[in-house]
């Protein structure tokens, strides 16, 4: 019997999902009933992405842009609770944007702790308003599970193994400096984890910048966005085939639901590469759009923009819909959908523009462009000698230091169709950028 218990504890320690299902209780959304913590499809994908990253990099650095009620915070709470309650000398730090949110998070953790099976429930040394310390004067786990609100007590200089920063886009004035202090408490490697998650709050700000830096692969972080339509709860079945056909026939004709935008959503898809398996693919169905209409009517007070804010379809839509822009958001969102659709239908080619490849006395051409999949130049349409082109350039400082430096960008436009046919995006000295733009101009 004792040997069986040892084997069970070992499995619980090495298999977080087994631990979630058999040891943790959470409150079911809506009913408030305590239920076993079983991962939904979004949580399951995030879990596999994190496990893959920790196997590859010996740590997790993940930034998550989310829609409402996907259970991202619940998953991170459960993951970190498992780390602290099943391992010695671990420190968990969770920081939220408001005291109310901090209280909700801590109550979730306390519920997990209070309902643990007694056989694996660690001894509690201290439990305060926003802190649990497992251990005893004689030893024990000596693991700390602590929560705080941004702007609260200083944590700079502390050692943190697992950091969760919640709703970072809402951290407000001083939030970026506070975040920097927290991140510097987490060392690289050693299976440490730092997870930043938030709904969008417009363009600009530390969360927006960090997300896009990670998305482009320039920061050492991994970015992920979960669109609303991949969640199985966000569908509404039709009563019969006739109702489904009738719905399809009028799709995109009602301005309350976005008009043409609604029709363009049908078939929009996303994929998640979670390892050795084939990528998981999710696609907008008529059932998704049926639920979308109901949600706009009942949960968003017939306000389409509120739906965009709460349930974005793309990462760009998430940031655009929540900002205070000059241009109409509906049209911007429609343009985003058009661009996403076109990028799937006409993928870009990658190229590299060598800098100062030419020297006097060599036969090599002065201005050259070389094919390279991950190059700084994206090309959707190669030059057509029968056309003229225009190049617009936005020159940045050029220094490739840190995530706060801007990108220099050159965009090639076909003035006859107003299409963007190529884009150069890089961080180099402005003089060297001029060489690249000259090469681009020679090509076009």
Regions found by a protein language model. Give the residues of each.
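Post-Walker A helix-loop "phosphate-sensing" segment adjacent to the P-loop in P-loop NTPases
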Residues: 83-90
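Long, charged, glycine-rich C-terminal linkers/tails
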Residues: 120-136
